[in-house]
Design a protein with these regions (language model features):
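Conserved structural position within tetratricopeptide repeats
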Residues: 58, 64-65, 106-110, 145-149, ...
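Short coil/turn linking the two alpha-helices of tandem helical-hairpin repeats
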Residues: 33, 38-47, 78, 83-92, ...
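Structural signature of tandem alpha-helical TPR/SEL1-like repeats
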Residues: 51-55, 91-104, 132-146, 169-178
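N-terminal leader/linker segments that initiate helical-solenoid repeat arrays
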Residues: 17-59
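TPR alpha-solenoid repeat register
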Residues: 73, 118, 157, 190-191
């Protein structure tokens, strides 16, 4: 079914719907790009994931070309480029790609300072990157705290905060964040995030 969706998008881009696409708004393109990013995340097939992320990246770039002041367009580009970089496992070796991702996050936050998704991603980068590459645990933790105020259901931010607490020796607080992340993931029906929250709890030596 997911492959059929990708095929329909590709066909639509090249055939009779071209006039409609020519007038498509940046907001609509950004929305479709984010949908592709999420579909790619949920797919278990590597080739299919790659197709979704590549298509999402192209849609995001078209959205930015139409409106460089669209926060969602820049965030959708970050989302698809970032997931494409992680297809074969996370790596910090691609510094050019990493800097490109951070630029898109910074542009998103510049345009929309309360963009919870961008703040969560930037905060996670700050707490995970070494200082040499721009990491700043204190600043990242503050940013992640802001995210959970903006979005009470934020899963990623809570998992990242749990990891910060583990790093700082605040195990009980970390367990609280991880358990709340697990509950939010269950409420949202996100099997992938449930697994991440459970892994964090295991790392903290807590039951779930």
């Amino acid at each position: 079914m997911l492959a059929a969706l990708v095929a329909s998008l590709c066909l639509g881009a090249g055939l009779g719907s071209a006039p409609a696409l020519a007038t498509e708004s940046a907001a609509s393109l950004a929305h479709r790009a984010l949908d592709d990013c999420e579909a790619g995340r949920q797919s278990g097939d590597r080739a299919e994931r790659e197709r979704f992320f590549n298509n999402g990246r192209d849609l995001a770039q078209r959205a930015i070309a139409l409106d460089d002041n669209s926060a969602d367009a820049h965030f959708s580009l970050f989302c698809n480029q970032g997931e494409a970089m992680r297809l074969d496992g996370e790596s910090l070796k691609d510094l050019v790609g990493l800097r490109s991702l951070i630029r898109e996050l910074d542009r998103t936050i510049e345009l929309q300072p309360d963009h919870a998704g961008a703040l969560s991603a930037k905060g996670t980068f700050l707490v995970r990157l070494p200082r040499l590459l721009g990491g700043d645990v204190d600043r990242g933790e503050a940013m992640l705290q802001r995210v959970i105020t903006l979005d009470p259901t934020a899963v990623n931010a809570r998992i990242s905060l749990a990891r910060v607490c583990e790093y700082r020796g605040r195990r009980d607080e970390g367990i609280e964040y991880a358990r709340r992340a697990l509950q939010c993931a269950k409420d949202l029906g996100r099997a992938d995030k449930i697994a991440e929250a459970q892994a964090m709890l295991s790392e903290l030596g807590a039951s779930y």
